[in-house]
């Protein structure tokens, strides 16, 4: 097996804000990756990821809608990420959680992120959990939303 196969990284949530920036970094640094969208991810594609040595799980929501809730997206898809890693023989998973996550949280968002972290911790995989605060950059949700509210004279 060649070195290039061992250096490929799987990414879920690659079209989101963090995912787009991560892909840009990988492209600039000639790092090989396989993108998995939320739709493809739900169909489980272990064969597609079999050449990956690591999986970065970025799929998540920060607000619930009538179509998506925290449990389904943040927790159940974390379980699928672990399952896909095991089926694909990927030993390392990286999970983006959130600053403020704890077992004592009262927020449904933070509770879902805590539960997803527990999925990673109890997976048997080598895991890394990041707990970023607001991530700000070009086209990020927070800055874009604030700019929109300023233009509408809401703030």
PLM ranges: what are they?
Residues 2-29:
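N-terminal Rossmann NAD(P)H-binding glycine-rich loop of SDR-like oxidoreductase domains
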Residues 8, 53-54, 92:
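Structural motif
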């Amino acid at each position: 097996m060649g070195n290039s196969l061992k250096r490929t990284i799987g990414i879920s949530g690659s079209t989101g804000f963090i995912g787009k920036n991560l892909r840009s970094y990988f492209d600039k640094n000639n790092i090989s990756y396989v993108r998995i969208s939320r739709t493809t991810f739900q169909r489980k594609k272990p064969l597609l990821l079999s050449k990956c040595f690591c999986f970065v799980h970025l799929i998540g929501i920060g607000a619930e809608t009538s179509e998506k809730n925290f449990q389904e997206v943040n927790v159940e898809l974390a379980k699928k990420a672990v399952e896909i890693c095991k089926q694909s023989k990927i030993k390392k998973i990286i999970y983006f959680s959130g600053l403020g996550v704890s077992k004592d949280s009262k927020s449904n968002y933070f509770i879902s992120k805590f539960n997803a972290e527990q999925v990673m911790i109890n997976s048997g995989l080598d895991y890394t959990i990041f707990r970023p605060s607001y991530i700000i950059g070009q086209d990020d949700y927070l800055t874009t939303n604030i700019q929109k509210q300023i233009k509408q004279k809401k703030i």
